[in-house]
């Protein structure tokens, strides 16, 4: 077996999965937890479990998938093969940017961290109404709009016809004019180059188009000899003899839009449409010679916000909005086609963007905040977008008002008479109350009038009138007298009477109402479903997406090469034959295998709460699994909920009830990074296991085992570099090892720091020491070397500076000052300041501190 083939085999599967512990004995560095879990296996019973600890991939497409990278259109396989050198597994990259969407559905450009190549024996093929076709791995998430209006990431294997796939409504490509691009559009639409003798012909019935082609030819190719003739059958033709023009067209592929065409894509599309565009009864149709060209034209049209449909080799533009945009942005040179197309704007229906609206969620927001916007049940997407804007304006006002009311109602209105006694002289003067009368109030021998109570409270800094006014506003706008009355244990008319009366007898009850209303405000402001609804409305108004209905979902079996681009943070990018938005747990599995043996899969359900956070997951998936009895003689089933701290408060409450309901035959294992985010009623029902970061020696032992098994040479320097970066995280350590192995079978510290996008710690320390010793310019030079040559971000450098500052040979007070400065400048970077300027300013601070 050759080295090249052997290396491909080594890297064809993520090692973090390949070397995942299968049994409890395989788990490294958590002996205190393994011991307790083994006891559960031995006894055959266990309580609900909560795994808490610090945070520890595969989403792939086929190689023929189109992707826009650095402003150009590539095939994904071609791009990854070029960047990875054909290697399987992850390959770190720098300077590669792709288009994706942010949390509000707006198009943005994102950095790619690494490219990935792998094999699979199973794919999901997806077709849509507009002619899109995607082939992705079964677990690849796609952004989908479901029948009930939900918008969420769904794994490909769970998609079904009728779901709506997110596609960008436009692509921010260069859309300018260019005479060469226009000439190429004409040539590729109606031109022909003879195999020899430098002859090019151009055939078109329209004399104006032939004239334009000849003008462009004369302008672009000075050596051209041009003549026009009419054949005996009446066919008009332009003959061009030009070595330069002939060489150009023979150097490009005629099945794709050439690079020169993309540089002036508006000009190219107009010329191509003049030649190959036709007007049908309800659409403009652009004919092509092959599917690849049709796909590229669809991408090009998307850059103008024109959503096209593919039908074989035809690109179809339909709907008034699309046709009008096409005519405004691209158009036809010929008046006859232009007039025909303009008639379609009046004939065709207004385009619907196809989004199913989540009326239930919108209604919840309206009811929760008592919004006054008129409801329209049969909303089109466009009307829903307008409604969301109206709602958002009202919501911002209401939330702002609720915060103001909360601030006012946070202050008690009961007077502390001991405090009045201390300030009696001031009260007598400002409240204008006689001394003997005030003394009786302080002793409780008589009560002040309500007016006097208000004046006394003012002296103590209590604004009773403002608080009562806030209570009235909340009761009328956000609650009801009936709701407050139920909580108070009285009738609603009593609440109204109390709030509007002016007797001091009601002050104690007013204080109770204040507390009730404050509690209700806090419930509203912390309502998870309300926040979800507001986020949905923001998305509805701001998103730059169109929704294409899925018509077919089919499973494919075979041996497939697949590719991925890893985009940290947002985990999605624009790809597909037409632009589409595509995306980017150990102890529980080991315990399930030990408990259930071969039947573990039948008795084990795994869910990721960060993907499936809503209350419906608890009500549907969990309950459906929990209702059935365990298989194979097991006494209970296991439901493993990863990233449980991502569940909403409502979902956690539903989970608590489900845990109680099915406690006889189901045990829950909840895994989270922060147990504090799990509600107390759930924590009290679980045995809690706190996973600690692994010791370096435990990680080192596992890495040496993997390296030996994979035929790698793991140097001591390389091992120490991995341990330094991993910081007790085994998953991170294994991923770094695999990424470094993609570069070389010898794992050195140089390769490790390269793939992990980290600077050497000694380089960071040297830079800081240079600054502290007063050598600012050399420190600045070292900083620029780290940033520019090693390609690190400013935040990466700051994180390492913070880690290394405590290892510097300086006095402790200076370390405190430096750590404080690093924190300050990190905040500046997070706020969006220029990283080079801020880091150089930080080094200047180091220099000043070093002189003290």
From Swiss-Prot:
Gene3D superfamilies: 1.10.8.60, 1.20.272.10, Hedgehog/Intein (Hint) domain (2.170.16.10), Homing endonucleases (3.10.28.10), P-loop containing nucleotide triphosphate hydrolases (3.40.50.300). InterPro entries: ATPase_AAA_core, DNA_pol3_clamp-load_cplx_C, DNA_Rep/Repair_Clamp_Loader, Hint_dom_C, Hint_dom_N, Hint_dom_sf, Homing_endonucl, INTEIN. Keywords: ATP-binding, Autocatalytic cleavage, DNA replication, Nucleotide-binding, Protein splicing. Residues 183-306 form the DOD-type homing endonuclease domain. CDD domains: AAA (cd00009), Hint (cd00081), HLD_clamp_RFC (cd18140). PROSITE patterns: INTEIN_C_TER (PS50818), INTEIN_ENDONUCLEASE (PS50819), INTEIN_N_TER (PS50817). This protein undergoes a protein self splicing that involves a post-translational excision of the intervening region (intein) followed by peptide ligation. This is Replication factor C small subunit. GO terms for biological process: DNA repair; DNA-templated DNA replication; intein-mediated protein splicing. GO terms for cellular component: DNA replication factor C complex. Disulfide bonds: none annotated. One of its GO terms (molecular function) is DNA binding.
């Amino acid at each position: 077996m050759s080295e090249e083939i052997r290396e491909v085999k080594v890297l064809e599967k993520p090692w973090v999965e390949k070397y995942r512990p299968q049994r409890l004995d395989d788990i490294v560095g958590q002996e205190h937890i393994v011991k307790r879990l083994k006891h559960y296996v031995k006894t055959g019973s266990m309580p609900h479990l909560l795994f808490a600890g610090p945070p520890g991939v595969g989403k792939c497409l086929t190689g023929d998938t189109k992707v826009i990278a650095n402003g150009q259109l590539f095939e994904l396989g071609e791009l990854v093969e070029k960047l990875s050198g054909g290697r399987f597994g992850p390959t770190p990259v720098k300077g590669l940017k792709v288009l994706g969407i942010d949390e509000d559905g707006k198009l943005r450009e994102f950095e790619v961290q690494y490219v990935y190549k792998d094999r699979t024996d199973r794919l999901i093929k997806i077709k849509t109404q507009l002619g899109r076709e995607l082939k992705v791995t079964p677990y690849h998430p796609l952004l989908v709009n479901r029948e009930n209006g939900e918008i969420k990431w769904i794994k490909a294997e769970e998609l079904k016809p009728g779901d709506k796939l997110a596609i960008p409504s436009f692509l921010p490509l260069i859309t300018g004019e260019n005479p060469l691009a226009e000439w190429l559009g004409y040539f590729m639409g109606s031109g022909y180059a003879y195999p020899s003798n430098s002859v090019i012909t151009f055939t078109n019935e329209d004399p104006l188009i032939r004239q334009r082609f000849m003008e462009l030819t004369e302008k672009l190719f000075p050596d051209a000899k041009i003549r026009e003739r009419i054949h005996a059958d009446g066919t008009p033709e332009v003959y061009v003899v030009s070595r330069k023009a002939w060489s150009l067209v023979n150097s490009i592929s005629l099945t794709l839009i050439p690079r020169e065409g993309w540089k002036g894509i508006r000009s190219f599309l107009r010329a191509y449409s003049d030649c190959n565009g036709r007007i049908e009864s309800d659409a403009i149709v652009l004919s092509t010679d092959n599917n690849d060209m049709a796909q590229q034209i669809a991408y090009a049209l998307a850059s103008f916000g024109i959503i096209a449909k593919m039908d074989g080799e035809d690109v179809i533009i339909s709907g008034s909005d699309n046709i009008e945009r096409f005519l405004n942005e691209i158009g036809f040179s010929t008046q006859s086609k232009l007039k025909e197309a303009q008639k379609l704007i009046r004939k065709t229906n207004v385009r619907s963007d196809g989004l199913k609206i989540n009326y239930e969620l919108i209604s919840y927001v309206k009811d929760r905040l008592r919004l006054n916007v008129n409801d329209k049940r049969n909303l089109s997407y466009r009307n829903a977008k307008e409604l969301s804007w109206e709602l958002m304006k009202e919501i911002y006002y209401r939330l702002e008002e609720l915060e103001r009311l909360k601030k006012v109602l946070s202050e008690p209105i009961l007077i502390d008479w001991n405090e009045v006694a201390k300030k009696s002289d001031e009260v007598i003067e400002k409240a204008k109350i006689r001394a003997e009368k005030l003394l009786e109030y302080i002793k409780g021998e008589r009560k002040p009038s309500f007016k006097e109570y208000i004046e006394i409270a003012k002296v103590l800094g209590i604004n009773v009138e403002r608080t009562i006014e806030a209570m009235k506003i909340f009761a009328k706008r956000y609650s009801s007298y009936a709701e407050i009355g139920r909580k108070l244990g009285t009738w609603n008319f009593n609440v109204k009477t109390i709030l509007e009366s002016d007797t001091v007898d009601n002050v104690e009850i007013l204080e109770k109402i204040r507390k009730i209303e404050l509690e209700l405000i806090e419930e509203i402001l912390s309502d998870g479903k309300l926040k979800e609804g507001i986020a949905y409305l923001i998305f509805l108004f701001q998103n730059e997406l169109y929704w294409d209905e899925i018509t077919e979902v089919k499973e494919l079996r075979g041996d497939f090469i697949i590719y991925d681009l890893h985009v940290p943070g947002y985990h999605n990018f624009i790809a597909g034959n037409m632009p589409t938005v595509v995306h980017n747990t150990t102890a529980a599995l080991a315990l399930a295998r030990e408990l259930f043996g071969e039947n573990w899969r039948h008795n084990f359900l795994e869910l990721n709460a960060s993907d499936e956070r809503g209350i419906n997951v608890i009500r549907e998936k969990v309950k459906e699994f929990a209702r059935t009895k365990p298989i194979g003689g097991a006494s209970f089933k296991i439901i493993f909920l990863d990233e449980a701290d991502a569940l909403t408060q409502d979902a956690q409450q539903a989970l608590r009830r489900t845990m109680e309901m099915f406690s006889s035959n189901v045990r829950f294992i909840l895994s989270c990074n922060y147990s504090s985010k799990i509600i107390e009623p759930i924590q009290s029902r679980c045995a809690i296991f706190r996973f600690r970061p692994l010791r370096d020696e435990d990680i080192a032992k596992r890495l040496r085992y993997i390296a030996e098994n994979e035929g790698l040479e793991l140097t001591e320097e390389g091992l120490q570099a991995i341990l330094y970066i991993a910081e007790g995280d085994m998953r991170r350590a294994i991923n770094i090892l695999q990424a470094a192995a993609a570069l070389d079978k010898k794992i050195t510290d140089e390769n490790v720091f390269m793939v992990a996008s980290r600077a050497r710690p000694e380089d960071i320390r040297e830079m800081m020491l240079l600054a502290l010793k007063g050598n600012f310019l050399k420190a600045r030079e070292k900083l620029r070397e780290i940033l520019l040559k090693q390609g690190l971000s400013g935040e990466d450098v700051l994180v390492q500076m913070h880690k290394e500052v405590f290892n510097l040979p300086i006095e402790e007070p200076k370390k405190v000052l430096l750590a404080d400065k690093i924190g300050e400048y990190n905040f500046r970077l997070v706020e969006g300041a220029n990283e080079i300027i801020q880091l150089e300013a930080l080094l200047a601070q180091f220099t000043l501190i070093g002189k003290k």
